[in-house]
Amino acid sequence: MTKVITRFAPSPTGMLHVGNIRVALLNWLYAKKHNGKFILRFDDTDLERSKQKYKNDIERDLKFLNINWDQTFNQLSRVSRYHEIKNLLINKKRLYACYETKEELELKRKLQLSKGLPPIYDRASLNLTEKQIQKYIEQGRKPHYRFFLSYEPISWFDMIKGEIKYDGKTLSDPIVIRADGSMTYMLCSVIDDIDYDITHIIRGEDHVSNTAIQIQMFEALNKIPPVFAHLSLIINKEEKISKRVGGFEIAYLKKEVGLEAMTIASFFSLLGSSLHIFPYKSIEKLVAQFEISSFSKSPTIYQQYDLERLNHKLLISLDFNEVKERLKEIDADYIDENFWLSVRPNLQKLSDIKDWWDICYQTPKIKNLNLDKEYLKQASKLLPLKITKDSWSIWTKEITNITGRKGKELFLPLRLALTGRESGPEIAGILPLIDREEIIRRLISIA
């Protein structure tokens, strides 16, 4: 049986966003599910926009999500191989030189669209005479190269979308080599997939037409194409997610929103599938439940709120031993198990625990100055002598007996005086963490 080999091929022209991290996760999970191999490839043929900084950022984000690769390479290191295949395809008459300028091509495109025609290249360069070609060369024009597509029907079975068919006549011969000699994504990707024995490619449905073209490239090189799966796109406010839409970068979700790695991994591994989105504690458990057949053909809606809610669910499921290392990472290794268990139910992000530590062990900032001072003074006198886990219940019952207060009128002034916040962890759990004298001091300082 052929070993499964998948790949993730980002362009280092920006930071990873939720759309392409989803592609990375699913390719990695598919490989691991089948005891296969996962390759990280950098499609850096865009010399102007590709940056080493973005390569470093991509690797950092993948490592953060526990996506480890078995092999990595970048396309710029393989230029000689691409030119070898270029010459082979020219000899096979599947690549041909074109001499139109960008302006001429744009004019052709506009004319076709104005007539209600699809913007398909007319193959005019195939009819150039030697004299015309020589004239272009003398003008200083350098050729770009297109792949010659067969007009035969193209079809394949997609692991998500099922049978897909294309009429070759509806596709335009793609430019595979620019006039400056640099290579575009289309052919380079096919050559890499052949040389690295890629067996399965999982990517967004915006690549479906590319797949139709690339299948012909595989066939032109006498190779069997990989198995394809095209994911429905992630939609947010009617927009497709891309690196040009701000706020969706993994670095942003990690640093600004405060999401845990397994929150992001769990969410985007299951988003768009029929499986329940559950906050898994380890990437290995995600591998065990992963099924590519569970993914839907329909567009997938992503909302940041759903991620934040899942992050909360993950945090409240973690035992202290499971979170100790993460506490060290955020410089909160002073947190002990008792404190963790007390505040855990109300954490939206892990760093919130530092705020609650400050609430318990530093004087809170009281924003509401309209508290009933006499009530707080009276409450301070009713505080039990020994503070235990039952003290809050005993204390508030006694306050009710003496003052007649109930509900919000009873609880909110006490919470504000003790924590400076209108909501948060159960005071029953927080109270034993604060020294009795400090509790009285906070009540009296307002009263």
Swiss-Prot record:
Official protein name in the record:
Glutamate--tRNA ligase 1
Q: Identify the PANTHER family for this entry.
A: GLUTAMATE--TRNA LIGASE, GLUTAMATE--TRNA LIGASE, MITOCHONDRIAL-RELATED
EC main group: ligase
Residues at which ATP binds? K243
Q: What is the lineage of its organism?
A: Bacteria, Pseudomonadati, Pseudomonadota, Alphaproteobacteria, Rickettsiales
- Principal location listed in the UniProt entry: cytoplasm
Tell me the compartments it is located in.
Cytoplasm
Kindly list the cysteine pairs connected by disulfide bridges. Answer: none
- Which PROSITE patterns is this protein grouped with? AA_TRNA_LIGASE_I
Q: Which reaction does it catalyse?
A: tRNA(Glu) + L-glutamate + ATP = L-glutamyl-tRNA(Glu) + AMP + diphosphate
The UniProt record lists the EC number as 6.1.1.17
